[in-house]
Amino acid sequence: MFDKYDVIVVGAGHAGCEAAAAAANMGSKVLLATMNMNTIAQMSCNPAMGGIAKGQIVREIDAMGGYSGIVSDKSMIQFRMLNKSKGPAMWSPRTQNDRMRFAEEWRLMLEQNKNVDFWQEMITGIVVKDGRACGIRTGMGIEIEGKSVVLTNGTFLNGLIHIGEKKFGGGRAGERAAKGITEQLEGLGFESGRMKTGTPPRLDGRTINYDKTEEQEGDGDIRGFSYKNIELPATQRPCHITFTNQAVHDVLKTGFDRSPMFNGRIRGSGPRYCPSIEDKIERFSDRDRHQLFIEPEGWNTVEIYINGFSSSLPEDVQYKALRLIPGFENVKMFRPGYAIEYDYFPPTQLELSLETKLVKGLFFAGQINGTTGYEEAASQGMIAGINAHNLVKEEEPFVMKRSEGYIGVLVDDLINKGTKEPYRMFTSRAEFRLLLRQDNADIRLTEIAHKMGLASDERHQTLLAKKESMESIQQFIRNLSVTPDEINGFLGNIESAPLKQKVKLDKILARPKVGIENLSEVIPVLKDFVSTYSEQWIESAEVEMKYEGYIQKEREVVEKMNRLENIKLRDDLDFDKLSSLSAEAVEKLKQIRPKTLGQASRISGVSPSDVSILMVAMGR
């Protein structure tokens, strides 16, 4: 009935879909197992992709040949580039998406891949023989053989949904929890924990008075995540902004005694940076209002996602409070918000390839590793899919460095530091933000992915054309001289110091408030030259030139870090015998077993003096 698969992926959320796509596109025969074929790639929470640091991750997935960027672009209903008022290291693309079309596009792309098969059933266990994963066991008792297994169970492992004093098993509203896998893994020696996340109520957009809210349009310059030429929408749907008030807070407080968060019924750790509305009121009691975003769920639906109002309070309290919000006086609720508790496995139990240390051929990706967010999950899925394929084909694991991508930062943080609360990516977590911009993910990663057989020849050719174009633009600007007569009027308008003699144009470009776009308006020859190039390629060329000195400094730091990465630690190194190491360092080093001195230096509890001791032990 079943072939023997190279890779079996359990769970078809964002992590599972990217894992299946990556392994299949590299040539593995893949089975994607899900409890419900109709919920493949479902956006369980907000109908949006990207955002601060997350947008960079989606672009990195796309640069590697993953599908999240393409699907996001095809299902986009609004685009915004966040943080444009800050430097380019902080610019982060974000899309509002049609929830239904997003899932449809993902399923269509997977179904068009001849290397992907599907099976709909609850998976209750992994078949493990001689310390190696070699298949899965279904609820009907069927065993399906596989050379590797990727677990991407999301919030389904012993999921428990809370609404006020009510609680019931489920992995998502209206769907069953997954039973059996946690218990088996614990029996194999894995440590597990509990985490919690939440979602807001869904509202009927026909009952909202938008005149009492603030409209938030998308950017006029619509862009996408994908480096491929995806057709983008000609129009956009606006979001809206409203605020809570003291009356709303007072009503919400009446339900605190029935809140599972406050009465101790929820044991799992919740996301620090995405608190529920009741948590915000409790923690920030000095605030008399909190901002809410009214987000449409798609082109052809009236359903509204109310971002910022996540709650597990009783449904009657949620409803009463909503009706006190400006614009919501007559609002109807489609379903209440809820909190969900689920099992996760501390990610320090993984290798940097996302393969488990205890069971060969078993990989974890997504919320099972303690992360939160579609983008974080999708990126882990891609890494796990790549490495499951590499394991089966007896190739070296792929490990993205911290200096190569936000995905590298994410995985490195998880494995070396672990997490006791849902981990979310921020730009502040990356030490090389100027190197890891959203505009250059293809320059950083597409060549690597092409060599692995993941990024297509078409992507590679586009990358080569972009690099050549950027070099041409930069060379033209470096060679072009401008006189005081040509440029001083422009400089005066932007309150920049006038020229006293002729200079090369790159010296002017380095100044604040100066860009290729506004320079083109006063230098016709520049305007003619750049008119033949892509706007985004021009922007990348400009950023590289304007921030050249800072970028070079970051590259020098990366070089120093890479020297530590190149010092391998012996697999048989006995940390107990290094008596000068601190007790905490010995404990952490034994737990994580770092492969390199660089990795050891980033482990929480390992000090610079401990690193020096390791260097001596390695004969350096």
Show which residues each predicted segment covers:
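Beta1/beta-strand and adjacent pyrophosphate-binding region of the FAD-binding site
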Residues: 2-15
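Conserved N-terminal/central alpha/beta ligand/cofactor-binding core
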Residues: 4, 21-125, 140, 152-172, ...
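Short hydrophobic core segments
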Residues: 10, 143-154
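An anion/pyrophosphate-binding glycine-rich loop and adjacent beta-alpha core
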Residues: 36, 54, 182-319, 327, ...
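Conserved beta-strand-loop-beta-strand element in the redox core of flavoprotein oxidoreductases
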Residues: 127-143
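A glycine-rich dinucleotide-binding beta-alpha-beta segment and adjacent secondary-structure elements
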Residues: 305-371, 399-412, 534-588, 593
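Internal hydrophobic alpha-helix adjacent to the cofactor/substrate pocket in enzyme cavities
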Residues: 377-398
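Extended, charge-enriched "interface" segments that sit outside catalytic cores
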Residues: 429, 435, 446-612, 616-620
